[in-house]
Every structure is written in structure tokens, then in C-alpha cells.
From Swiss-Prot:
One of its GO terms (cellular component) is plasma membrane. The gene is ubiD. Signal peptide: none annotated. The keyword Lyase applies. The lineage of its organism: Bacteria, Pseudomonadati, Pseudomonadota, Gammaproteobacteria, Vibrionales. It comes from Photobacterium profundum (strain SS9). Keywords: Cell membrane, Decarboxylase, Lyase, Membrane, Ubiquinone biosynthesis. This is 3-octaprenyl-4-hydroxybenzoate carboxy-lyase. Coiled coil: none annotated.
Length: 631
């Protein structure tokens, strides 16, 4: 499937029943977010809002709201085919010459695609049919969405930001959110390791004090959009990769105010510059973590020109607690990552970024273990091989007989193959996403690796004694009632069936003080010691459903700094038949404090969870059936 532009893709999706036109007037202030959130959670279609209230420009949203539509945008029929995209990227990252005639013939399709990598520059392009410049530049005429009740201002979300470093031969395309602060100004929020930020830093070194040129394109063709979110090698332009995906050269045109190439088929383009000395406070915004982020200082992007198609379409999205559109993109791009990792680490069988872990904060890896300590090498490889994973806080490594995408399978392996102290790797003072308020310092926190593989002889000296005493029968309902009498702050108590011999407990509490979670852990261990040896206890707040792994993993990845919030107890009594313990009958325990932190537990301002406006919810309730989105 080849899509020349966004409209070509829209037509295709509509023919396939994958796009719904919304003709009713809908407010871009939170109403579109509410409608898209319901649609995405139901696996529904892309949405084209033809009459956003107050504007004459339609809004396209939920475009990549299912992994299948991401695959379609990459020219594939099925999500599984995205592994082929990953294999292509793995080859481009480390190309190898043919090892003979047969290998050359096998690689011929790849070699042919190389002809689609150069861009095709046009003299005229649809994206420059309409031009605003000077005083005519007015972002208020574009239907920029406000997504959540406490968002500080409207937010531009799907723009492809085009930059070029002074010492680099290629342009960089990246997607960074932009807060509207004036008719001609937005705040450019990009992380320090991202391509645009690196280009700006190089520019400031070589052109101190001079304005840094930028162009931002909205509504490019799907291959170019997805090329900007795919982990292409640093030496490869996103435009070149889009040409490979599409099977034809990416058409570009020179910006009016600078030398940057922009997608010729884009719907709307913003051109301008960053003054290296101009900053503004960005945020707070409801983010993909499910919380409002902290206010941070970022550079201001001043817009000198706006160009667009006649009758343009504005492409937008929202971010919120998973699942959201970025989480869905993460699920699809997960398939691209696997072959890239396998080329460097062929022992890896599967690699999974669970969307409930905010797409990148947790990775689950299965492998063919080949020697003692192998799991820790894989952990280090995940954290260091691709910069996309430098902010991943938790890595769980398992054998290849475990299903990395099934929490029941993962938890069973953790409870039967781990001694928590021996098999946990904690690394402090590592790079962390600045949006992660759980870290002790902005941009700096800890990482945790869990080795849930079967241990080799050199990794454990334990041998079974065969003398374990049977624990008394444990009636869960009676036990839970007794526990709640001792700890009335406990809201729910759950022993997952997939955890071996009740060796994991998950508890939700009404937290009322710093250190409360640790006290509950101690109480749960003391109570359960009458019946079973619980190696793992997880404590969450009462807004978490402890019987839903999506909720629990979300709490762990958003509310924990691994080093600060993990309690490890060595030399604890363990079932003598537990072969994972270092000493017969003596092992270790792990407690995870996945609660919101109080003053005294963190020095940072804690995130506020996103909550919807009840009036907006009620308004959408009233028109939901009329919209007919899921019919």
C-alpha cells in the first residue's frame, strides 16, 4: 500500500471502515479528547471532525488508534509484518556485504529499495497553496485542542519538527509537543537527548546568539509521520526511511523562510526560529503517564510564516493515562524493535513494552539463556543499545518458555525462579524522563533489572533438603477478613493465582502518612507467615484495582523510583523446597511501594492525576449514540 499524502490515507481508511466522519459541531476544548478516548478504548476508527466549534478547519484525530492502522500507515497489511520493517532497520544500522551470489540475490529487494531513499525536491507543492506571513500569522485560526481541564493552554501535538545541525549532512524529523502562548509563538518542549535538541545545542555552539531555523509540518503522508517516531539509525534521514516504507521517494519542497525541506504534501506548515535566549514556562499538561507534568523552562519557537493547503486538515491527538494513541504506537513499534535488538543480541526471543507501563518505562524480555549472568548482560544491552530505552526504569528478563506478553506467565516465572535480593539489579543516578516525577531529581533516577530466568549451577548453591513442613491450610476469605481487622486502612488484598504457593500479595490502602506502605508490607508478611512464604508484596493506593495487572503495572511504573521505593529483606525464612533461594530454607523478600509519595518521601512536587470534567463527560454521553462511531 502506497499513500501519496494524508488524504489518500484518509480515503483508504474510509473505504475499509476504519474512519468515521463526525458532522456534528464538537468543541476542541476537551470534547474531542473525550470522544477519542472512548473510541480508542473500544478499538474504534479514526475520526475526522468536520465542524469543530469556532473553526473552519477540520480536525483529524485517533488516526493511529489501533496497531492495525499503524501497520497500514507503514504500508503493511498486518501488525506482524512490522517485524520486516525492523529487519530492514537492523540491516541499515549495520549493513553487511553479500556473502556470495545467493545472499546477494536474497538482499536484492533491499538493494532496490535504496533507490527510494533520496528525496525528490519540488518547485511547487500543495503545502504552500496558502501563505500567511507577518501580521497575518495567527494560530488562533487553527483548531488547536485543549485536552484536559487543567491544561494551561491549547497544545499542538502531531507536528513533525524539522531541524538541521550545523555539522550534520541530514535533516532531523521529530515530534515534540508545543504549547501555544501567542498568535505567533509556541513553546518547544523537547528532551535533551532528542534530535532537535541536539541540533539546537550544536547550533548554539557554532552560531552563538543567532536564531535557529525550524519548520513544523502537520498532516504529512503516513510514512513520513511514522518515520519520525521510528528508531531510525542516526546516519539515516527520516525522509529516506519514509521512502523505504512507501516504496517511492519522499517529495519535499524548500521552506519559504529557511533552507529546510518540508513534506510537499503536508496540510499545514509553521516556519520560524528559536531565539537561543528566549525561554518560557511550559505546562502543566495532562501527559501519557496519566498525570499533569511539572512546569519546566523551554525555548520559544517564533513563527514567521504559516503555509497550508487550500481547505487544510489539522492532525491532532491527546495524551493521557494508557491506553492513548502514543501507547498504541508503542505496541505497534514494539514489533519494529524486536529484530533490531535481535541483530545485536540474537539470544533475545521476544521483547515487549507493555502499554500500561507508559510504553517505555518497563520492558519484558525473553531469551535463550546460554551462561551464568546472561540475563544481566541482556538488561545492560536493553538500557544501552538504543537511546529509546535510556529512560526505561524496569527490565524483566525471562527464559524463552515464558510468554512476555502475558502477565500470568511472567508472574509465575518471577515467583518460581527468583530470589529477590540475589536476582535484582539496582542502578542509581541514571538518566530518567524529566516527566517522571517519581524520580528523586529531575532527569535523574534509578533503574531495576529482575532476573526471572532459571538459575544455572554457578548462580545458586541451594539444594533441596526435602524436609519442608506443610503450611496450614489457608482460607483466603477468612484470612482476608482477619487481615482487614488488623489493618483497617487496607481496601483490598489479593493473592494472584498465577503466583506460586501464594508467594505474592498485592494490597491497596488508604494511605495517610509517609512510610505507611512499608508498615503495611511488614504487617502483611507477618500475617502471611502463618500460612505461606510470600516473597513479593506490592502496596498501591486505593485508586488502583489490585486484581487488574494493567492498573498495578501502571502504578509501579509511575509512582516508584526503584531504589528508593523497594524494600529488600535478606535471610528471610523460605520454603526449603524453594530451589531459587541461595541457602536451603533461607532466602529473601521484596516489597514494592507503588503508592503516591507524601512529603518526607520525596523532595519533588508530586504529579496530580488527570481527572475528566464531569460536564464534558455528560455532554458527550448525551450525543454519543447520535455520533454512531462504533455502529
Amino acid at each position: 500500500m502506497k499513500f501519496k499524502d494524508l488524504r489518500d490515507f484518509i480515503d483508504y481508511l474510509e473505504q475499509e471502515g476504519q474512519l468515521k466522519r463526525i458532522k456534528q459541531p464538537i468543541d476542541p476544548n476537551q470534547e474531542i479528547t473525550e470522544i477519542c478516548d472512548r473510541t480508542l478504548r473500544a478499538g474504534g476508527p479514526a475520526l475526522l471532525f468536520e465542524n469543530p466549534i469556532g473553526y473552519d478547519i477540520p480536525i483529524l484525530a485517533n488516526l493511529f488508534g489501533t496497531p492495525e492502522r499503524v501497520a497500514m500507515g507503514m504500508g503493511r497489511q498486518d501488525v506482524k509484518e512490522l517485524r520486516e520493517v525492523g529487519k530492514l532497520l537492523a540491516y541499515l544500522k549495520e549493513p553487511e556485504p553479500p556473502r556470495g551470489f545467493r545472499d546477494a540475490m536474497d538482499k536484492l529487494p533491499v538493494f532496490k529499495q535504496v533507490f527510494n531513499m533520496p528525496t525528490k525536491r519540488l518547485r511547487k507543492a500543495p503545502c504552500q497553496q496558502v501563505i500567511w506571513q507577518g501580521d497575518d500569522v495567527d494560530l488562533d485560526k487553527i483548531p488547536v485542542m485543549s485536552c484536559w481541564p487543567d491544561d494551561v493552554a491549547p497544545l499542538l501535538t502531531w507536528g513533525l519538527t524539522i531541524t538541521k545541525g550545523p555539522n550534520k549532512p541530514r535533516q532531523n524529523l521529530g515530534i515534540y509537543r508545543q504549547q501555544k502562548i501567542a498568535k505567533n509563538k509556541v513553546i518547544m518542549r523537547w528532551l535533551a537527548h532528542r534530535g532537535g535538541a541536539l541540533d539546537l545545542r550544536d547550533w548554539m555552539d557554532t552560531h552563538p546568539g543567532e536564531p535557529f531555523p525550524i519548520s513544523v509540518a502537520f498532516g504529512a503522508d503516513p510514512a513520513t509521520i511514522l518515520g519520525a517516531v521510528t528508531p531510525v539509525p542516526d546516519t539515516l534521514s527520516e525522509y529516506a526511511f519514509a521512502g523505504l516504507l512507501r516504496g517511492s521517494k519522499t517529495e519535499v519542497v524548500k521552506s519559504l523562510s529557511n533552507d529546510l525541506d518540508i513534506p510537499a504534501s503536508a496540510e499545514i506548515v509553521l516556519e520560524g526560529y528559536i531565539d537561543p535566549n528566549e525561554f518560557a514556562d511550559e505546562g502543566p499538561y495532562g501527559d501519557h503517564t496519566g498525570y499533569y507534568n511539572e512546569v519546566e523552562r523551554h525555548h520559544v519557537f517564533t513563527i514567521t510564516h504559516v503555509t497550508m493547503r487550500e481547505d487544510p486538515i489539522y492532525h491532532s491527538t491527546y495524551t493521557g493515562r494508557p491506553p492513548d494513541e502514543p501507547a498504541v504506537l508503542g505496541v505497534a513499534l514494539n514489533e519494529v524493535f524486536v529484530p533490531i535488538l535481535q541483530k545485536q543480541f540474537p539470544e533475545i526471543v521476544d521483547f515487549y513494552l507493555p502499554p500500561e507501563g507508559c510504553s517505555y518505562r518497563m520492558a519484558v524480555v525473553t531469551m535463550k539463556k546460554q551462561y551464568p549472568g546472561h540475563a544481566k548482560r541482556v538488561m545492560m544491552g536493553v538500557w544501552s543499545f538504543l537511546r529509546q530505552f535510556m529512560y526505561t526504569k524496569f527490565v524483566i528478563v525471562l527464559d524463552d518458555d515464558v510468554n512476555a506478553r502475558d502477565w500470568n506467565s511472567v508472574i509465575q516465572a518471577m515467583t518460581t525462579r527468583m530470589d529477590p535480593v540475589r536476582d535484582t539489579l539496582l542502578i542509581e543516578s541514571t538518566p530518567i524522563d524529566s516527566l517522571d516525577f517519581a524520580s528523586p531529581v529531575v532527569g535523574l533516577g534509578s533503574k531495576m533489572g529482575l532476573d526471572a530466568t532459571v538459575k544455572w549451577e554457578a548462580e545458586t548453591a541451594s539444594t533441596p533438603s526435602g524436609t519442608s513442613q506443610a503450611a496450614p491450610d489457608f482460607d483466603i476469605e477468612t484470612g482476608t477478613r482477619n487481615l482487614l481487622m488488623q489493618f483497617p486502612e487496607i481496601v483490598d488484598f489479593y493473592l494472584p493465582q498465577e503466583a506460586d504457593k501464594n508467594s505474592m500479595a498485592i494490597v491497596s490502602i488508604k494511605k495517610d502518612a509517609a512510610g505507611h506502605a512499608t508498615r503495611v508490607m511488614d504487617g502483611v508478611w507477618s500475617f502471611l507467615s502463618q500460612f505461606t512464604d510470600a516473597k513479593f508484596v506490592i502496596v498501591c493506593d486505593d485508586d488502583v484495582n489490585v486484581r487488574d495487572w494493567n492498573d498495578v503495572i501502571w502504578a509501579i511504573t509511575t509512582r516508584m523510583d526503584p531504589s528508593r521505593d523497594t524494600l529488600l529483606i535478606a535471610n528471610a525464612p523460605i520454603d526449603s523446597l524453594d530451589l531459587t533461594s541461595p541457602v536451603v530454607g533461607l532466602g529473601s523478600k521484596m516489597g514494592l511501594d507503588a503508592t503516591n509519595k507524601w512529603q518526607g518521601e520525596t523532595a519533588r512536587e508530586w504529579g496530580r492525576p488527570i481527572t475528566k470534567d464531569p460536564e464534558i463527560v455528560a455532554k458527550v454521553d448525551a450525543i454519543w449514540n447520535e455520533l454512531g462511531i462504533l455502529d
